Amino acid sequence: DVLGSRGLGDVYKRQNWDWFSEKIRNAGRPVKVLNLFAYTGGATLAAAAAGATVTHVDASKGMVTWAKENAVSSGLKDAPIRWLVDDCVKFVEREIRRGNTYDAIIMDPPSYGRGPKGEIWKIEDMIHPLIRLCAKILSEDALFFLVNSYTTGLAPAVLTYMISTELKSWNGHVDSQEIGLPVTNSGLVLPCGASGRWESR
């Protein structure tokens, strides 16, 4: 059997939260973070607790409500967080038109999903175009760009290629890792996704 998949996923997420929280705290300036496919808000709250102003976007109204409740229970009710129920791709396209930029972008896209108006999301077809769009709203002195993918269809090397290609204008470094679950009876690791981190040098 597979050992607590959710537990290991949570451990991996917390490692990412610790990583970017330190970057936000050490930036020495105000940091604007965009969190796409933001679910129940773990990354949003970690970034806000570290001192960032956060825009939290998810297509599910129920998830955004849950995330707001998590903010209250975490003592972050009054933190500078903007809560939005929206299709992530359409939101980014509007931000490009508005000329808004962010110092850091986090995304945790599903393998498959639907936007609030029935928009279809398929990670294999849409992740690279979305990274390309996000590069257009990344500030000149960006801190980090984080993509988590819980699908085996996206290898770490592919994630590194996509992020490196779209963020080549920034002076930074990409590191991508496989996310895996330990299988108790064999000692092997079951691949379940990949995580790609870009950080400024």
What is each PLM-predicted segment?
Residues 40-52:
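Conserved SAM-binding loop of SAM-dependent methyltransferases across substrates and taxa
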Residues 142-201:
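C-terminal catalytic and target-recognition region of SAM-dependent MTase-like enzymes
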Residues 138-140:
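Helix-to-beta-strand junctions that scaffold the AdoMet/dcAdoMet cofactor pocket
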Residues 62-104:
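S-adenosyl-L-methionine
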Residues 61-63, 85-89, 102-133:
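Mobile active-site "lid"/loop adjacent to the S-adenosyl-L-methionine
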Residues 1-12:
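Single conserved hydrophobic/aromatic residue that forms the stacking wall/gate
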Residues 53-58:
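Conserved SAM-binding motif I beta-strand of class I
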Residues 30-37:
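Conserved class I S-adenosyl-L-methionine
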